[in-house]
A protein has these predicted regions:
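Short, small-residue-biased leader/transition segments that mark boundaries at the very start
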Residues: 1-7
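Short, conserved loop/helix-junction motifs that constitute active-site signature segments
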Residues: 48-52, 76
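Conserved positions within well-ordered secondary-structure segments
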Residues: 24-27, 83-89
């Protein structure tokens, strides 16, 4: 039986965070307020750069050009697989117990039907272990 190290990054980490954080409540003033944002560290990209034989699986949440954007992410972040979610599909993404995903590797695209998130997790593991 073959052993494999893998990393599955399934958190929707924010791409940006506030540059300045107030220590106390910000009082209402006349006019509008702007909040300056800074980019957060790209955890998945860092893992891909440091990869040493591990299988790296990331997630992609898209509202347009899902397959194209997810393939770019696969390559740019040096992942072995991206689990792509189209947030515009009914029953997919956040806020429910179901999801509809496409498993994307360099050579494959496997569209999974709508199923529970637990079932999706099992399919992801089965797919990875079959590699």
């Amino acid at each position: 039986r073959r052993q494999r190290q893998m990393c599955i990054r399934d958190r929707a980490v924010a791409d940006y965070r506030p540059l300045h954080v107030a220590d106390e409540k910000v009082k209402k003033q006349d006019g509008n307020m702007s909040i300056e944002l800074e980019r957060t560290d790209d955890i998945l990209k860092t893992l891909g750069e440091r990869k040493n034989g591990q299988f790296i699986c990331g997630f992609s949440m898209e509202t347009e050009n899902m397959l194209e954007n997810s393939r770019k992410k696969l390559e740019k972040k040096n992942c072995d697989m991206i689990v792509a979610n189209n947030l515009k599909q009914d029953g997919a993404g956040f806020g429910g117990n179901t999801n509809i995903v496409t498993l994307i590797t360099k050579d494959d695209e496997v569209q999974l039907e709508k199923m529970t998130k637990d079932e999706v997790a099992e399919k992801i593991f089965d797919f990875i272990l079959s590699r």
